[in-house]
């Protein structure tokens, strides 16, 4: 289904409910630049770095697009996904079932989730929705529950240190969304709806958060204007 949620003002606070879940795949494909390519890159990273029978946990798995891509590439991987939106997980379960993929799903908030050992944790545009006071604590749990040699892949919308540069980058991004078919009204409505819900960090803030958890090697492997993907190695 096509994302037309923001054609009119929202009557309630934005949340990943059934309405959003039903159009999420279209929404994210049109709202996040190079989303499909970034997902493919993450799949390749995991395929190359994860050991045989590795345990992979997708934090904020939404409709399980990444988990399905991993299943198609490597049948040996033990896959799990966490999301706090029931509507998202309903679609995720239907999609994985249709392809015969065995995935363990958990319906929980990350700050309440009982983390368990994995070889890879992934959070694609997830941490930006976690309240800042809780964010470091969750990254700490990710590090503590990574097996030695494990990796954490994190994609985030980012801010720039310089306010003027940041403003220009946002303008470039909003032009991108117009090119994807969103009207200026839809863009403005969504921006207002996500204010104080999606809270991005700067590149340095994200890197420092990873370092504070114990990660020693942190690399940026993808960046487009105000979107970036980091890989942290334990």
Swiss-Prot record:
Q: List all disulphide bridges recorded for this chain.
A: none
What does the record give as the organism's lineage?
Bacteria, Pseudomonadati, Campylobacterota, Epsilonproteobacteria, Campylobacterales
Top-level lineage group: Bacteria
Q: Which Pfam families match?
A: Methyltransf_25
**Organism name:** Campylobacter lari (strain RM2100 / D67 / ATCC BAA-1060)
Q: From the Swiss-Prot or TrEMBL record, give the protein name.
A: Carboxy-S-adenosyl-L-methionine synthase
Query: SUPFAM superfamilies, per this entry?
Result: S-adenosyl-L-methionine-dependent methyltransferases
What the entry lists under Gene3D superfamilies is as follows: Vaccinia Virus protein VP39 (3.40.50.150)
As recorded in UniProt, its EC number(s) are 2.1.3.-
User: What's its top-level EC category?
Assistant: transferase
């Amino acid at each position: 289904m096509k994302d037309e949620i923001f054609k009119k003002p929202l009557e309630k606070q934005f949340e990943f409910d059934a309405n959003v879940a039903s159009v999420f795949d279209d929404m994210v494909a049109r709202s996040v630049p190079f989303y499909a390519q970034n997902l493919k890159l993450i799949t390749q990273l995991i395929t190359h770095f994860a050991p045989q029978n590795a345990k992979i946990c997708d934090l904020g798995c939404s409709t399980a697009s990444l988990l399905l891509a991993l299943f198609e590439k490597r049948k040996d991987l033990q896959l799990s996904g966490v999301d706090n939106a029931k509507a998202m997980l309903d679609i995720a379960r239907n999609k994985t079932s249709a392809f015969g993929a065995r995935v363990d799903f958990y319906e929980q908030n990350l700050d309440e989730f009982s983390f368990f050992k994995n070889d890879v944790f992934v959070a694609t545009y997830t941490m930006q929705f976690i309240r800042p006071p809780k964010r470091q604590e969750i990254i700490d749990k990710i590090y503590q529950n990574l097996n030695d040699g494990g990796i954490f892949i994190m994609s985030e919308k980012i801010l720039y240190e310089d306010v003027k540069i940041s403003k220009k980058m946002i303008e470039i991004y909003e032009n991108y969304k117009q090119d994807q078919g969103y009207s200026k009204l839809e863009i403005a409505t969504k921006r207002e709806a996500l204010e104080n819900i999606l809270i991005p960090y700067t590149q340095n803030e994200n890197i420092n958060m990873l370092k504070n958890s114990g990660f020693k090697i942190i690399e940026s492997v993808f960046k487009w204007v105000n979107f970036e993907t980091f890989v942290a190695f334990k």
